[in-house]
Amino acid sequence: MTVPKEAEGLIGSHYRAPDYFEVGREKIREFALAVKDDHPAHFDESESAAAGYPDMVAPLTFLAIAGRRVQLEIFTKFSIPINIARVIHRDQKFKFHRPILAHDRLYFDTYLDSVIESHGTVLAEIRSEVTDADGKPIVTSVVTMLGEAAHQEADAAATAAAVASISAGKLGAI
């Protein structure tokens, strides 16, 4: 396994998402329904308070909503030499520093920790440090993406089209 030539100098790169993600009570409720998490603390502030939370608490996987948007931006900002139309989410680890609550503003600082290539396949490890408006940590996420290698001859327009298609939820459209 080697570092792809196109990735030299990218490892350690930092990207701060240009805007925060504001956590809304209704988004928490909608997400909890979508993932079939029926814990009452995701639907009722009094239940959250009874469980010891200062506001409505989000399900643990709620970060996926904002995280997906940031993750797609990463592939274009870092120019990772991977064919975005042929990539899978291989692994993800979370370290929760505190629960995500209604009215939180989530800020994403994302780092490209490693990129390796072997036999035409690229593994990229991306770490996101999610903080609140005061800069205090909420969640650390480390995701490993696996995909077909894309080299200099790869078309930037094709990458942009793949990102747009994935964003629109058309996974098989490419």
From Swiss-Prot:
InterPro entries, A to Z: FAS1-like_DH_region (IPR039569), HadA-like (IPR016709), HotDog_dom_sf (IPR029069), UPF0336/Enoyl-CoA_hydratase (IPR050965)
MaoC-like domain segment(s): 11-131
Example of a GO MF term: (3R)-hydroxyacyl-[acyl-carrier-protein] dehydratase activity
Gene Ontology BP annotations: fatty acid biosynthetic process
PANTHER family, alphabetized: HYDROXYACYL-THIOESTER DEHYDRATASE TYPE 2, MITOCHONDRIAL (PTHR43437:SF3), HYDROXYACYL-THIOESTER DEHYDRATASE TYPE 2, MITOCHONDRIAL-RELATED (PTHR43437)
Homology family: Belongs to the UPF0336 family.
UniProt protein name: UPF0336 protein MAP_3996c
